[in-house]
């Protein structure tokens, strides 16, 4: 791992798994750092990431006082992966809609893969489904323009 190689920035919104995410990125041979989810755009730009991961967290993305990522990250031209709250806040910030789900998902869940996508590259997909860990009570109900559903679960029409 060198600082001149690809660098992944992980924005932490309070997930209990942020350190695990960073470890997995580093195990893949990619340098990563964790910053607070609400860090300013200039600090993100100074880090010059080749990709950004938005972590999960305990908040509801549709709440007025929920933490938000700097909006400029969405125009930096780097790939962004939102996990749980990270996906929800990205959807909400870009014009989608997130609401409370009638059913919470906690523990192992099955995600039905809707279409092939490089996000699933190297992951064993069995009969078009993945076993994943879920911990959330909200769901994305309307996607932002230009987004597509690539996976869903029983309680989340947009799980990936």
Model-found features: residue ranges?
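A short, well-structured beta->alpha microelement
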Residues: 29-45
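Residues in the short beta-alpha loop(s) of Rossmann-like NAD(P)-binding domains
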Residues: 14, 38, 86
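Cysteine-nucleophile active-site neighborhood
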Residues: 23-24, 28-29, 46-123, 129-131, ...
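Hydrophobic anchor at the start of a short beta-strand
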Residues: 8, 32, 80
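Short, surface-exposed beta-strand/loop micro-motifs that present aromatic residues
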Residues: 157-160
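Short, charged N-terminal beta->alpha structural module
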Residues: 7-28
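Short, hydrophobic/aromatic-rich segments at coil-to-beta transitions
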Residues: 144-150
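Extreme N-terminus of proteins, especially the signal/transit-peptide cleavage junction
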Residues: 1-6
């Amino acid at each position: 791992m060198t600082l001149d190689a690809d660098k992944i920035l992980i924005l932490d919104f309070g997930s209990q798994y942020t350190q695990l995410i960073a470890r997995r990125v580093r195990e893949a041979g990619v340098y990563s750092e964790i910053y607070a989810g609400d860090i300013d755009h200039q600090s993100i730009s100074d880090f010059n990431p080749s990709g950004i991961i938005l972590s999960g967290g305990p908040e509801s993305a549709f709440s007025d006082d929920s933490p938000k990522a700097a909006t400029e990250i969405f125009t930096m031209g780097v790939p962004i992966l939102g996990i749980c709250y990270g996906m929800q806040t990205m959807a909400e910030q870009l014009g989608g809609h997130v609401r409370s789900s009638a059913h919470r998902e906690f523990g192992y869940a099955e995600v039905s893969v809707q279409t092939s996508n490089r996000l699933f590259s190297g992951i064993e997909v069995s009969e078009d489904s993945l076993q994943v860990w879920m911990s959330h009570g909200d769901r994305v109900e309307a996607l932002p323009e230009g987004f597509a559903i690539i996976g869903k679960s029983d309680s989340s029409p947009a799980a990936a």
